[in-house]
From Swiss-Prot:
HAMAP family: PSII_PsbA_D1. Fe cation binds at residues 215, 272. It is an enzyme of class 1 (oxidoreductase). Pheophytin a binds at residue 126. It is found in: Plastid, Chloroplast thylakoid membrane. InterPro entries: D1/D2, Photo_II_D1/D2_sf, Photo_RC_L/M, Photo_RC_L/M_CS, PSII_D1. Keywords: Calcium, Chlorophyll, Chloroplast, Chromophore, Electron transport, Herbicide resistance, Iron, Magnesium, Manganese, Membrane, Metal-binding, Oxidoreductase, Photosynthesis, Photosystem II, Plastid, Thylakoid, Transmembrane, Transmembrane helix, Transport. This is Photosystem II protein D1. Chlorophyll a PD1 binds at residue 198. PSII is composed of 1 copy each of membrane proteins PsbA, PsbB, PsbC, PsbD, PsbE, PsbF, PsbH, PsbI, PsbJ, PsbK, PsbL, PsbM, PsbT, PsbY, PsbZ, Psb30/Ycf12, at least 3 peripheral proteins of the oxygen-evolving complex and a large number of cofactors. It forms dimeric complexes. The lineage of its organism: Eukaryota, Sar, Rhizaria, Cercozoa, Chlorarachniophyceae. The chain crosses the membrane at residues 29-46, 118-133, 142-156, 197-218, 274-288. One of its GO terms (molecular function) is oxidoreductase activity, acting on diphenols and related substances as donors, oxygen as acceptor.
Amino acid sequence: MTAIIERRENSSLWARFCEWITSTENRLYIGWFGVLMVPTLLTATTVFIIGFIAAPPVDIDGIREPVSGSLLYGNNIISGAIVPTSNAIGLHFYPIWEAASVDEWLYNGGPYQMIVCHFFIGVCSYMGREWELSFRLGMRPWIAVAYSAPVAAATAVFIIYPIGQGSFSDGMPLGISGTFNFMIVFQAEHNILMHPFHMLGVAGVFGGSLFSAMHGSLVTSSLIRQTTENESTNNGYVFGQEEETYNIVAAHGYFGRLIFQYASFNNSRSLHFFLAAWPVIGIWFTAMGISTMAFNLNGFNFNQSIIDSQGRVINSWADIINRANLGMEVMHERNAHNFPLDLA
């Protein structure tokens, strides 16, 4: 048998570029989604940093009452934010070239829309990049599926909610105090605390924290010691070792006796799927709740639903929450309303 070896022809520049982009040997995987992710996230990050430091006040309500958000205009890390695009712009696409000047663009909050749009494309591309790398390594796609939960949450507050309310000025400000303001106003207008999807999200986040702490503490408490008493147990682990690093039987037995037998997983794969699925599904529900409340399908209203035999109202906690909602509602954007309550 004769083997014929031919010298490989020099590949084109484009072919070498494609090979480099999709190579899993790079220190950081780029991928085709990364080609879109890198410039969009760099743009969003750069504009955010510059805007947080130096952006002038923004006329968020469209009534010529600008709100300051940057450090150079009197804010600190906690009170500072990228102020949302003006209500005068609404949902219009507002790039720099649509404004008469850069000053007008800044006054109307153009940077917020620029950051949010690039950030949205960037995080979606990051999710796609996770799937792409998993595919090339022969892994299952669940990492990208799990990441879809925070992507859905960000999409809900930055994209879906402004669309439903008719203006980017209703989007979540990009700052700490601005986020709190968004939460308070959202409760006032939509009664989110009484929405079952938000309740499921709370169960997902708090439950996920509890399960993570339980799992971590159980594993840490049942490590198989490979070191002396005078050395850290952690030093007994060798990266890539084939044998188990902890005794799952001991952990299962402990937890089964602490609660009851069937509360403890005896399958490591089922356990880790549960740890991933619980918070992800909870955050999915919260994102769906925000997206439905965006179109004013609000939380439950049990106001004045309990009355005595004489027809007098017996207040429940729902009525107390409603009273708080009314107070928050009439106090926010107090110069923008012609009526005590939004007609929506």
